[in-house]
Amino acid sequence: MGIILFVLGLPGSGKSAAARHIKSFARRKKFQARRFKDYTILNKMFQKDMEAKRFRSTRRQGYDGFDVLDFNVFDEALQKLHHDILRRKKLADNSRELLIIEFSRDDYCEALSFFSSLGLRYAHFLFINSEILSCKARIKARADHPRTLDDRYVSDYIFEAYYKRDQQQYLKTAIQFNQRFGIPLDHIHAIHNGSDITVQQFFQEVEAFANDILKIKV
C-alpha cells in the first residue's frame, strides 16, 4: 500500500503549487507520484453545459474561466474524482505510490465522505492557509501571466457565494476528521502561506512536510 495525500485549501492559497512541488520532490525520491484534481472535471462539465444552467463563463470579466451556479456540481465532481482514482492504472508494486488528491471545498468533512473507500485513517492531509486578499491577488497575477496549467481564473463571486463558509479553522477541521473518520491528528498538517511568506519559505515548509511523510516508506 502506498501513501495517499490530500492537499486542501482555498483557490489561490498555493495548494496547486504545493501539490506540484510535492510530486516533483517525491519523484526525486523514487516514488511513483500521481496527482488527481477536480478542476479538469469541473471544466469538462462547464464545456458540456451549453445552456449555461449550472455554470457561467467569466469571459465578460476578461478571463477564460467559469463560475459555478449550481453547487451540486461540486459533489458530482468529487464523485467522478473518486471514480477516476479507483480506476487508475495499477502499479506492479504500489508500495512506493504517492497519490496526491487536490481540491477546494467549503466543508471538508462533507467532501471527504466521498473518499471513504480509500482508507482515510491511513491518509495524510495538508491544508494550505492564506488570507483571502492574498488568494485573490495570486489568482489575478496568475490569470494575467499564466505559467502553468493550474494558473486559472477564479472570480470574486465564488468566494462570496460559496467559499465564505470555509473559515480556514483547520485545527477544528482536524478534530472533526479525527472524530468522524478516525484520522490520526498527526496525519493532518497546515502550512501558512500569507503575504508575509516568501515563495522560498513556502516551498521549504512544503518540502519538509513531504520529506516527513515519505520517510514512512523509506
Q: At which residue positions do the language-model features occur?
A:
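P-loop (Walker A) phosphate-binding loop of NTP-binding proteins
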Residues: 10
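Conserved glycine(s) of the Walker
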Residues: 13-14
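A glycine- and Lys/Arg-enriched "phosphate-lid" helix/loop adjacent to the NTP-binding pocket
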Residues: 120-173
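Conserved substrate/cofactor phosphate-moiety recognition/catalytic segment
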Residues: 17-83
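Hydrophobic anchor at the beta1->P-loop junction of P-loop NTPases
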Residues: 7
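NTP-dependent small-molecule kinase module
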Residues: 164-218
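Glycine-rich phosphate-binding loop used to anchor ATP phosphates in small-molecule kinases
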Residues: 63-120
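Short, surface-exposed basic-aromatic patches at helix termini and helix-loop junctions that form
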Residues: 22-28, 112-122, 140, 144
